[in-house]
Amino acid sequence: MLLDEKVTENEIEGMVRLFLENVKSGIWRSQGWPAVWTDYAVSKLALNGHSKIMAKLFKGRELSVNCFCPGFTQTSMTGGKGKYTSQAAAEVATCIVLLPPEKLLTGKFYVGSTPGVYSNHLHCLVVHEKMRRAKT
């Protein structure tokens, strides 16, 4: 779904409705939905799809719409487990948001568990590294 550049709101909402129907019917496992954090994963799929649509809608209006996944982060959702602190995740998210407009893409999904996978934004990685070093 997310690879389809022409995905529509109706298609996203249809996917969510199908998931909910499958859950109510008790057949969601046999229908191939994610086995781990199922509802979370489906909601993030919908969020990413809507973000892509919004990015197209606001294109040319000096507004970027993106999603960001910091990776396995220590939060209440993970029971305090995770590879990264919420502070570290917030620093990278802030870095992405503060990229100059000409370097910040729109309609993208930023995945980050280690520096280097943030959509090749070298500027962001350099700033993040400087922030990390300043704390030590």
Question: What do these predicted regions represent?
Answer:
Residues 1-59, 69, 80:
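Catalytic loop of short-chain dehydrogenase/reductase
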